[in-house]
């Protein structure tokens, strides 16, 4: 950052003694005293003549309108500083913008599109295993072929492979998060963790314990270490991943059930689930009287018994019974009913049907 301040000698000429600075302003570029009207100051305390502050590569004058970089006592503009000292892609040797995402392998930085196998040109994605040979990337398949062709003395012999072990590609990071090369090299010296593959017996043991207790205590984990032969970290991570997967699966099932319940539409009509309410008690305040039913006798039973005991005209009686059974009495004409009733004798009061005691 370049700041512009007034020179002390210029302030003396203006008669402003209150703003006079103690000491003399010396130019860092030429080493002489600054008597100009303006002084260009580069943070924190470097002062320059306006004519001395320029890029050592392109001789562009640097002022408050541009960014100034100082390295080893030399000043650079932003373009030349990035070109000379900025982080470059190990594949295409081009620089990075502030918004680029990069991939790292040991002390090298790559564009995402440049992070490819040098043999088959397959792009290496996060999670893929790779190796580094002479600052070049090899995928897992080509790394195995290089090891197999080693005894033949080919250029891809194990002696030329600096890293026999496979690394796992990490997620891309912002170029702003990429540290200096020396710092990157220190981080890359750490052992890269490789995914552990479990066999059927180990999986069965872990699943059985998970079904019994999804959150085992320290004692149970120690027993699992002895039973499976896995490290405590692998067992802890497996249980964490298992709980996370089950939680996601349960949330997904609830969403599917909710969506299935919302789709209860039939020919444009939406079905609504009805839920039966709780039973309520009988309200004794409702008026009512109990009825004692001792026996029930069909209405035509007494008439049939009377017909068997009396001398009635059988055809007329059968016609009357058929009317009562078929329910067609209401559809008959009034003359028929009158003719049938005229043929029946008068029934004495003593013959009125009464309930039969049982």
UniProtKB/Swiss-Prot annotation:
Domain of life from the UniProt record:
Eukaryota
List the Gene Ontology MF annotations in alphabetical order: cis-regulatory region sequence-specific DNA binding; DNA-binding transcription factor activity, RNA polymerase II-specific; metal ion binding
Q: Which residues bind DNA?
A: 191-250
In terms of one coarse class, where is the protein primarily found? Answer: nucleus
In this chain, composition skew of type Polar residues spans 336-358
| Keyword annotations from UniProtKB, A to Z | Developmental protein, DNA-binding, Homeobox, LIM domain, Metal-binding, Nucleus, Repeat, Zinc
Q: Where is the composition biased (Low complexity)?
A: 325-335
The protein's matches in InterPro entries, at most eight in alphabetical order, are given as:
HD (IPR001356), Homeobox_CS (IPR017970), Homeodomain-like_sf (IPR009057), ISL1/2-like (IPR047169), ISL1/2-like_LIM1 (IPR047244), Znf_LIM (IPR001781)
Family annotation (SUPFAM superfamilies): Glucocorticoid receptor-like (DNA-binding domain), Homeodomain-like
The keyword DNA-binding is assigned to this record: yes
Residues annotated as domain LIM zinc-binding:
27-80, 89-143
Q: Where is this region: Disordered?
A: 325-358
PANTHER family named in the record:
INSULIN GENE ENHANCER PROTEIN, INSULIN GENE ENHANCER PROTEIN ISL-2
Q: What is this protein called?
A: Insulin gene enhancer protein isl-2b
